[in-house]
Amino acid sequence: MRQITVQFTSFRDIREFSVLAARQPFQITVGTEKYKVNATSFLGFFTLNCRRPLIAQFDCSEEDYARFLEEAAYFLVK
């Protein structure tokens, strides 16, 4: 299981990340230690506190991981 930390600054960011997650050949969950939602569920994000960094978790190959990190670079917490 891989995980990255992401953060969103607007509804548009959430929508774009949700669309990005839907294009992946693997499932992505986003949330906190306590609450997790499917990253393709735009409405699911509204059950989370998106003002704070969130953890995105997924299980994928090394190639898919590298490609996803490139595509999701804007959302990564540095």
Label each region the model flagged.
Residues E33-K34, S61:
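Short, ordered loop/turn segments at secondary-structure junctions
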Residues F8-F11, E62:
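Electropositive phosphate-/nucleotide-binding environments in soluble metabolic enzymes
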Residues I4, F26-I28, L54:
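Conserved beta-strand core positions
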